[in-house]
Amino acid sequence: MNLPAALFTPSWPAELELAYARHGERTTPVRRRHLGPLRVQKHLHAEGPEVCQHIIVHPPGGIAGGDRLDISAHAGERTWVQLTSPGAAKWYRAAGVARQDLRLRVEAGATLEWLPQETIVYAGAQAELHTQIELHGDARLFYWDIVALGRPAADERFASGHFQAALDVRRDGRLLWHERQRVSGGDGLLDSPIGLNGQPVFATLLVSGEVDNELLERCREVNIDGVRGDLSQLAGLLVARCLASEALKARAWLIALWRLLRPALLGREAVPPRIWST
């Protein structure tokens, strides 16, 4: 159920701690600790025993002022973990700050895919997201996030509030990616050509590894109406960005890249989780 963008005051802390281990050819959860309304559904092995998929759910349906979400996932050696969500995360208008802390740790020989659906930040929300990712040895990462500011379909611009995000990725303690974002409601950057250029949605994709020029060009040729995006190959990390008119279009662009990059960098064809189709 979609709740109205009212001014919420109660706070609701929630924690979720996940860990995975490899047993023979099978990746299995070995720790599932939760506090408050954060949960995971029963794990799935839709691609076979090697890949363990978990769907993270937040039954309240939205995050409001004073809420604190703390999520951690540890992919043990040689595991393959895929984490996604059943729907958009909604950050509601509120008088206080709401915060999410995400910590991902990926051990040598392991693969972690963080593939949530979009984050919708309502006008008047005060949303702060902090993400730390630690890779060890030859660990592999496929990470994306999609952020929609306001609700353009409801003619709601992001005229007040703020969205703030911090993202750090390290391999064996060495910093690979360091990013800080802050967008305030009504800021000129929302419409500036050096900012969001009037687009309400932006998305980021980070993939460990390097691709050749041919595959990079194939990725750049992905054409989704209403999306402007590009990719950059850094040392050991591929970065993709886009601006979009709708969250669904940004997600379609990311999925198209995932279909191209997953076989090349992770050695497995892309199989969309069934929850994305419901």
Curated annotation (Swiss-Prot):
It comes from the Bacteria. InterPro entries: UreD. Signal peptide: none annotated. It is found in: Cytoplasm. One of its GO terms (molecular function) is nickel cation binding. Keywords: Chaperone, Cytoplasm, Nickel insertion. Required for maturation of urease via the functional incorporation of the urease nickel metallocenter. UreD, UreF and UreG form a complex that acts as a GTP-hydrolysis-dependent molecular chaperone, activating the urease apoprotein by helping to assemble the nickel containing metallocenter of UreC. The UreE protein probably delivers the nickel. Belongs to the UreD family. PANTHER family: UREASE ACCESSORY PROTEIN D. This is Urease accessory protein UreD. The gene is ureD.
